[in-house]
Amino acid sequence: MPSIKILSVNVSEQKGTPKRSVPEIDLSPLGIESDAHAGSWHRQVSLLAIESVQKFEGQCGKKFGYGDFAENITTQGFLLYHAKPGDRLRCGEIELEVTQIGKKCHGTGCAVYHNTGACVMPKEGIFARVLQGGKLQAGATFDFIPKNYQFDIITLSTRAYKGVYADLSGPEIARLLGDFCAEKGWPCQITNHLIPDEVGQLTSLLTQVIHQKSDFIFTTGGTGVGPTDITPETVKPLLQREIPGIMEEIRRKYSAANPAVLLSRSIAGQSGNSLIFTLPGSVKAVREYTTEICVHLEHLAYMRMGLGH
């Protein structure tokens, strides 16, 4: 976990102008008091690494001071643009959550761009919102805490639970999700669970992992019309909202080659912090469903954080 030194804290009364270095800033739930960018939005605090500034200086042949790129906090020791939305910066009681990497350049409306024809903030600056406020001074350090995504995979199969055969679908989902997280650079923890086809056990386990704020919950099995298929009707009462489009599109896409896909009652939705997907039980089906769901996972994660569309 890298330690990030704070070289300067900076404020301005107007947007689109350089910020001036000050001895201390006061972070509140709305951002930095007395700074033009404070407010109830996701870009309350801007940060830029001195390493990015120095690289830009070498490219344009000019020197820049703290706050010249309108950053609130100038740092050293970590290339901030390697962070991702959901990562956190902590200094004592102060905690910031990264919400955006880079931004659209203001072009000629930006003082730096006007002078140099380019700017570093749109590509290498980051933005954050305040989760816990306090007073922050130059010389302090941030601990960088990457967002660790929690995945819980629940296989429903009485026969697999009794050892009649091995669970292959749950591990296949775990493999696909692990590959997805590796591609995105997401730290993750993937936990597999195996339970019989019982309403009580599924309800209890779902309630537990939702309470633990699991980010993504995948179930496999129990989505058909057989006498032991109980997954959708057990999951649905726990949802605050459904997300019907994903499963509808999967059924539409794969039913052209296999009409039996239309018999799946798979659903998706949100319960508290958790996004839940109920998948069929076959290995082939979980490959198809998980592959399609992964297309939307990053967007869903950021929307759930309140980071827009």
Regions found by a protein language model. Give the residues of each.
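Electropositive, beta-rich accessory/interaction domains or terminal extensions
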Residues: M1-K103
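Short, basic/aromatic beta-hairpin or loop at an interaction surface
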Residues: K62-N72, C110-G125
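Short alpha-helix capping/helix-loop boundary micro-motifs
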Residues: T74-G77, Y81-H82, G125-G134
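Mid-chain, well-packed structural core segment of small domains
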Residues: G77-G109, R241-L262, S266
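Loop/turn positions that initiate beta-strands
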Residues: G86, E93, G133-T141
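Glycine-rich phosphate/diphosphate-binding loop of Rossmann-like nucleotide-binding domains
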Residues: Y149-D197
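N-terminal small/polar loop signature for handling phosphorylated ligands or for N-terminal nucleophile
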Residues: G178-F180, G185-T220, G224-L239
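Proline/glycine-rich low-complexity loops and linkers
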Residues: T231-H309
